[in-house]
Amino acid sequence: MKLQYLVALLSVQAVPPVTAGYIHQYALVGSAIRQPIDQKTQREDLNKLVSDSPLLSLHRTICEIESVSNREGAVGEVLLKYLRDRGFTVEKQIVPADRGTNSTAERFNIWAYPKGCPRPKIILTSHIDTVPPHIKYSLHAPDGDFDRAKVRIMGRGTVDAKASVAAQIIAALKHLKSNKDIPLGLLFVVSEEVGGSGMVHFSNSELNTNPPFFHTLIFGEPTDLTLVDGHKGNLRVTIEAKGVAAHSGYPWLGRSAISEILPILARMDELGDIPVETGGLPSSEKYGRTTVNIGTIKGGAADNVVPETASASIAVRLAAGTPEEAEEIIRRAVYDVSGGSTNITVNFPDSMPYPPIDLDVDVEGFDISTVNYGTDIPKLEIHDEELEVKVKRYLYGPGTIFVAHGAEEGITVGDLEKAVEGYSKLIDAAVKRGWPREVVVN
């Protein structure tokens, strides 16, 4: 045997399997060349990694079930059984289908608490619906040397917000295992992604007492494991224009609705960039500038017809002020551009617009951030006006909003596991703080 072949043979060493036997890899020492990993073996190892973890397996179970808004019933049933099997008393709170949908399937909020504790002091809450379309759950090993924490889990809802749901449940179970008397409740709602009717339903129900029986609410959304000290407000706007249809060869015989609406939309598009003094929307040091997104534009029937109608829908993320103040600024801007034309109509279709929402961040050990997206938080009316000590509201969760709703939605095992630690820290702080005095709930 030639010497160089002997040296090469002796230099081949198997890299020991890492992290409890997951992912078999082999390398040539001193070489960048790696033998290809058998795909079937890799898939089996990744699935075993998930199956061996209560957190990861719960997350996989609920992410594999499609739960687009208004079709949350199947994942709800799975969670009901999971929580009952682990000693929770679980209640269904039936929520009617949202307006404008054709769904007749039952769907519901989930209200769960330890036996004998129907009015828990600490509530962890998130949502079980997702945006469409459903994207199949999948596991992906990291490039290079295997690192368990870097295994990536992808699919719809893996971040927003089933990562929070799974982490909250596991954190609650761990605390109740160590102390069954901790007053923990779980609330998982539907339709967060399409207006928040699930949380509104809970807010209007007899479970939301006056004064509240709870002193802490921990909301779960993708926050990159930071504790959020607030998020922007939200206001929806629709603008409609009426014209007169005519043959495009004789446009002077009609009036273009699109031509009427375009300068108004141009003005709307800049309202967040100009000072209030010159007719713009307000900004703040904490949240930055108010942003305006013209989300949809519709109009016309064909390219050879002068358009009779045109419309646009707009989302405004408020950095300061109230929705009422923003509505007045928008009405004034539309009036100024249109000259008060009766062919233009402005509406604000959201029944519950809200200003910027400030949140609590008084628990040590977290990085602090603000976010631009909306949540269910303002949809839950808290009746603590007469209380000296107000209900605490925290917003925290695993994953980044930057991939939520997209084709590449995904989260690492490490971030998901860290979220359990984060929720546990928030629970510990709430238990330590306790309730300063007895409150009689009617």
Curated annotation (Swiss-Prot):
Binding site for Zn(2+) 1: D160, E193
One Pfam family this sequence matches: Peptidase_M20
Keywords linked to the UniProt accession: Glycoprotein, Hydrolase, Metal-binding, Protease, Secreted, Signal, Zinc
Cofactor note (record): Binds 2 Zn(2+) ions per subunit.
Enzyme Commission (EC) number: 3.4.17.-
Single GO biological process annotation from the record: proteolysis
Signal peptide: 1-20
A GO term, aspect molecular function: metal ion binding
Keyword Signal set for record: yes
Family: Belongs to the peptidase M20A family.
UniProt name for this protein: Probable carboxypeptidase PABG_01461
Organism per entry: Paracoccidioides brasiliensis (strain Pb03)
